[in-house]
């Protein structure tokens, strides 16, 4: 009853969203419910940032669409460091979602807390809407615009030329740049 959208990402193939049914990811719980067990499995599906490139394989965000209720959940991790997104099966045929910063299992990171100390993981933004992907993305876009801090660049935007994104692959020369700057 739930579709999960996974945002694959790589060097020259950014933001490649793939749609999976939760059952395809083995998040459908147990086949027999209520017979000498609690009726859900311990399976999980997760993806995370890797190394120093936080968007190396995936974007730090996700979408879950409930086909029965018509609700769509969209979320993002608000950190350029390590992060983890985890879906799993829960009681009653439900799914759970965990969004966090670095973890010991995936990133080799942990923090020991002394009595009375606390730790806050990375922030996340989320929205729930009736409807599909377009209303969900629109809601997250409104959120991003609302939380973005004002800065002088809002009034005077400079031109930034990224030669990696414009086919020079880190080997710019004045001549190469002149040939493509006006086209960019």
PLM region descriptions:
Residues 1-91, 107-109:
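Polysaccharide-binding surfaces and accessory modules of carbohydrate-active proteins
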Residues 80, 126, 164-166:
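Active-site beta-loop-alpha junctions enriched in small/polar residues
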Residues 95-105:
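Short, structured beta-strand/loop micro-motifs enriched in basic residues and often containing a Trp
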Residues 104-108, 177-178:
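Short alpha-helical segments and helix-capping/turn motifs at coil-helix boundaries
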Residues 111-130:
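Short Pro-Gly-centered flexible turn/kink motifs
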Residues 127-139:
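Short, Lys/Arg- and Gly-enriched loop/turn segments at beta-strand edges
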Residues 137-184:
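An acidic-aromatic substrate-binding cleft motif
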């Amino acid at each position: 009853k739930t579709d999960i959208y996974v945002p694959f990402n790589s060097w020259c193939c950014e933001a490649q969203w793939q749609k999976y049914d939760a059952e395809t990811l083995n998040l459908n719980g147990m086949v027999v419910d209520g017979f000498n067990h609690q009726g859900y499995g311990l399976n999980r599906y997760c993806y995370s940032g890797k190394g120093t490139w936080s968007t190396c394989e995936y974007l730090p965000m996700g979408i879950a669409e409930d086909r029965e209720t018509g609700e769509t959940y969209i979320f993002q991790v608000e950190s350029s460091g390590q992060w983890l997104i985890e879906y799993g099966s829960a009681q009653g045929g439900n799914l759970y979602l965990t969004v966090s910063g670095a973890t010991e299992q995936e990133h080799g990171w942990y923090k020991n807390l002394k009595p009375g100390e606390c730790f806050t993981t990375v922030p996340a933004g989320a929205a729930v809407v009736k409807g599909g992907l377009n209303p969900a993305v629109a809601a997250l876009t409104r959120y991003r615009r609302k939380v973005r801090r004002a800065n002088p660049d809002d009034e005077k935007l400079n031109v930034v030329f990224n030669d990696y994104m414009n086919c020079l692959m880190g080997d710019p020369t004045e001549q190469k740049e002149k040939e493509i700057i006006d086209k960019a």
